[in-house]
Amino acid sequence: MDIKNMRNVIVSLSLVFGLLFTVSGIIEIIIGLYSILGFKIELPLFVGDVFGGLALLAVGIAYFLGVKKAVDRDIKAVSYLFTASIIGLGIGVIAFLILISDAIGFLLGFEDWADWGFFNDLTVYLVLGMLAIIPYRIAKIISSSTT
């Protein structure tokens, strides 16, 4: 399988996930900035972390750079898809570890976690991190079939 034949797949995946990560990052940054200014905005899945939003934005930009490479028919397009997916997975793993640690605190009966629930830790980081498995697996298949 040649990278030129997979161009549409790479462009589509990179565009979709680039938009998901970029829009989520921008929303996260906006909510975080408003909370710094004293305004409280609550959206499901979003916690208002400015630096987390910047991380999501960086992953989205990496996906978009992959789109540019794929449109130019450059073999490096798979690398951008692969790298952005790995970073997205890393963000998801960190969110999952936070969920696990909070669950342990709840199960051990710690006072700070008395009112904890699973949906308290279900964040955009966890959702996007788990979704990043899709382009990761596809990029892995593409890279193994082009060698």
Curated annotation (Swiss-Prot):
Task: Report the protein name in the record.
Answer: Uncharacterized protein MJ0565
The answer to whether keyword tRNA processing applies is: no
Q: How does it sit in the membrane?
A: Multi-pass membrane protein
Q: Where in the cell is it found?
A: Cell membrane
Keywords carried by this UniProt record: Cell membrane, Membrane, Transmembrane, Transmembrane helix
Question: Where does this protein come from, organism-wise?
Answer: Methanocaldococcus jannaschii (strain ATCC 43067 / DSM 2661 / JAL-1 / JCM 10045 / NBRC 100440) (Methanococcus jannaschii)
**Origin: domain of life:** Archaea
Where is it found, in Gene Ontology cellular component terms? Answer: plasma membrane
| Location (main, coarse) | membrane
Q: Which residue windows are transmembrane per the record? A: 13-33, 45-65, 80-100, 116-136
